[in-house]
């Protein structure tokens, strides 16, 4: 399984420098949704990283798909902490790491 990062260039550049090969730069909200949907169909991806601010710019239907997706698992990082990360990890691996 691979990790992918989707977002604006200033967000993905650090991941690229850290060795993540599947980084996708998007220029607008339409490109963001399109790239997320493309990543959902890639069977080699296990984790997809997004900036938490970008989640505000996608449609409610796609947000629901992201929230319910176990494989690939979506992780939103950035300006605010993702309270659902604990639940996503628990669903993905079946263990609560915080206990």
Swiss-Prot record:
The molecular function terms in GO held by this entry are: ATP binding; proton-transporting ATP synthase activity, rotational mechanism; proton-transporting ATPase activity, rotational mechanism
Q: What is its main location?
A: membrane
The way this protein sits in the membrane is described as: Peripheral membrane protein
Query: Localized where?
Result: Cell membrane
Any Gene Ontology biological process = proton motive force-driven plasma membrane ATP synthesis
Supply the alphabetized keyword list: ATP synthesis, Cell membrane, Hydrogen ion transport, Ion transport, Membrane, Transport
Q: Which InterPro entries match?
A: ATPase_V1-cplx_f_g_su, ATPase_V1-cplx_fsu_bac/arc, ATPase_V1_fsu_sf
- What are the transmembrane regions? none
Write down any Gene Ontology CC term: plasma membrane
Note the HAMAP family from the entry.
Answer: ATP_synth_F_arch
Q: How does it assemble?
A: Has multiple subunits with at least A(3), B(3), C, D, E, F, H, I and proteolipid K(x).
Q: Which family does it belong to?
A: Belongs to the V-ATPase F subunit family.
This molecule's function is given as: Component of the A-type ATP synthase that produces ATP from ADP in the presence of a proton gradient across the membrane.
Q: What is this protein called?
A: A-type ATP synthase subunit F
């Amino acid at each position: 399984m691979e990790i992918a990062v989707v977002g604006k260039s200033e967000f993905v550049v650090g991941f690229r420098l850290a060795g993540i090969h599947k980084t996708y730069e998007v220029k607008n909200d339409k490109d963001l949704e399109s790239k997320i949907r493309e990543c959902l169909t890639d069977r080699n991806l296990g984790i997809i990283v997004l900036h938490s601010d970008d989640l505000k710019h996608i449609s409610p239907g796609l947000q629901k798909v992201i929230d319910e997706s176990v494989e690939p698992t979506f992780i939103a990082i950035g300006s605010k902490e993702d309270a659902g990360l604990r639940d996503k990890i628990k669903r993905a691996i079946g263990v609560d790491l915080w206990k």
